[in-house]
Each structure stands twice: as structure tokens, then as C-alpha cells.
Amino acid sequence: MQEPSEDQATSDELSFVHDAVLLQEAVAAVLGVKALPKQTDDESQNSLQASGIYVDATFGRGGHSRLLLSQLADDATLIVFDKDPTAISVARELANSDSRVKVVHDSFATLTDSLAAMRITQVDGLMADLGISSPQIDDGSRGFSFMRDGAVDMRMDTSRGQSVAEWLETVDDETLANVLYEFGEERHSRRIARAIKQMDSYDSTLALAEVIKVAHPNWQRGKHPATQSFQAMRIFINNELGDVDNFLEQSIPILKVGGQLAVISFHSLEDRRIKQFLQRHSKGQYPEDENLPMPPKRPRYFSKPKRVGPSKAEISHNPRSRSAWLRMATRTDADYVADIHP
């Protein structure tokens, strides 16, 4: 399963105003309720007025954060993370108008250290919406799109790190092919890698997409042949899967007893990681370690793991939600034991 691709979108979608995916479901999950209150004329009945400290680890354009804020009490705190400078600008505007909001311009992989800098050791809920956002796709200058021309950048945080174009200038064919295969599940990775490395320059996403298109021997109907390669390069350059792994592991000590974890993913590489993480930490399994003759049993850190997908109505309204999955779980009272992880 891959991320929703641009070629699967209609022309209306490509001029899309971002809608947060699984909005009601994710916010209800992070608050530990089955559903949010129905909105009525009686405003006092429209909010849960939940107290505590919550984290939106991927602010984006703030859809999930704004709904979550509407359900929080005046003494609650919402800490929002994002790598993207544009997203951070939006987050700071929100923080200026709502004192409950604290902004961190960094990856959610820095969760523990960033919270420690605020003298926060534990929180009541963690929420993340993984992958690329629609505004990032729709902005050709960011380099994520193979339907709009722009620089071959693909960095989530344009203020730091190496762009895809810079990486392509120096990477060898074999390493590139391995990246396309591992992070894009591209079966024709070697053929595509050779074609990419024969390019004179890497200054146009449309030119890069065309080279991949020509090199790709099998076109899948309804899917641009560059979809998986673009996904792979973006995931690699941003260390997305490594950040997800770090975030998930940090969620164990960071969540209070009864705290909620809610994570939305859009492709199988991410969803598989979340699924395996929750399975591993909700069953009290023995860790696989051949060096330990009688390894200690891993504590059961999470209970009630569930998976929820978008409704037919949401998919109809927002086709880009079709591949989304929300996984959620509740932190148990098991003490965190660091020396038997992962």
C-alpha cells in the first residue's frame, strides 16, 4: 500500500484546501472517549473540558490541534511539533491567540528532550498524523510533487539538512536503488536508479518524474510511475521511518497511566511499524535476544489497541484520505523498564 498519489486525484483535489484526515476519530482517541460531544446551541455541552497536557506531534495546518483545543479546559496545555517552517508559522499564530499552545520547531523524534526543556516529563495524550500533508504536495516549490514543477528538494524542514537534489549528485547507483526499493517498495529500483544517475542535473521535479516514467517498464493504471520513487526519496531524506520508531518508543515513558496514543499513517511502511510496536508492547511478549538465556518478560505497556479507517463519507469528501489508518492504544500502569528495549 502506498501513500495517496497525485495522479489519483482529480483536478479539484489538486487545488485542494487541506482537510485533516480522521479528524473526529483521532481527537476522540487522544482524549480517550468513543466520540466527541455533538455540537448543539448550548455551547456548555459542546466541549469535554479535558484538563491535562497533550501533544500534537505533527501540527501541519492545525486541523487536529484546533478541534482538540475546543475540547480542552482553560488550564490544559497543548504542545505542537512540526519540522516544516510554514507549519510552524501557522502554529505560532495560533499560539499568539491561545495561551494554552506551546510550539516546538523540530521533529517529534525529539519528544523527550523537547518536553524536558519545558520541565514536562509526562503527558496525558499523544497524537501524530504521519507523512506528507496536502499543502506540501500542492506547493510545487517544495519538491514533493511530480505533477507540478519545482526544485528537487523534498525536505520537511527547508532550514536544515540536505535536499534530494544534493543527495542525488553524490549517491551511487546501488545506494539509490536500495533506497527506492526499501522505502518505496519499487520492484524496478535498479533500472530507475541507473536512469536517474544519467541525468545532467536535478533541478526539476517534472524532469525527474519524466525520466522515471520512461525508465519504468510497467505502468499501473491510475498511478503515476514516479509515485513510489518520489515517496522513497522523501522518506529517506527526512529519516521519516527512523523518526517514527523513535517517537513510538519515547511514547512509553512519556505517557501517563491511562494516557492515550493515537497515530494516523498513510502507507504500509508506517502502518506496519505502528502495528508491530503496539503488538509488541500490548502482549507482554519475551524480547528476542539470543544473548539472554532467560530474557525478562517485556511489560505490557499498552492495552486496547485498535485500528480505524475513514468512513465512506470522508473518502467521498476527501479522496486523499482513502489510504489512511488510525491506530490507538491506552497506556497501562506498567513501569517503564529501559534496559529490555526495543
Swiss-Prot record:
GO cellular component terms, A-Z? cytoplasm
Q: Please tell me which top-level EC class this enzyme sits in.
A: transferase
Q: Might you give the EC number(s) for this enzyme?
A: 2.1.1.199
Q: Where is the composition biased (Basic residues)?
A: 297-309
**Alphabetical list of Pfam families matching this protein:** Methyltransf_5
Q: Its GO biological process terms?
A: rRNA base methylation
Q: Which HAMAP family match?
A: 16SrRNA_methyltr_H
Assigned protein family: Belongs to the methyltransferase superfamily. RsmH family.
| The protein's name in its UniProt record | Ribosomal RNA small subunit methyltransferase H
Native species:
Psychrobacter cryohalolentis (strain ATCC BAA-1226 / DSM 17306 / VKM B-2378 / K5)
What is this protein's gene name?
rsmH
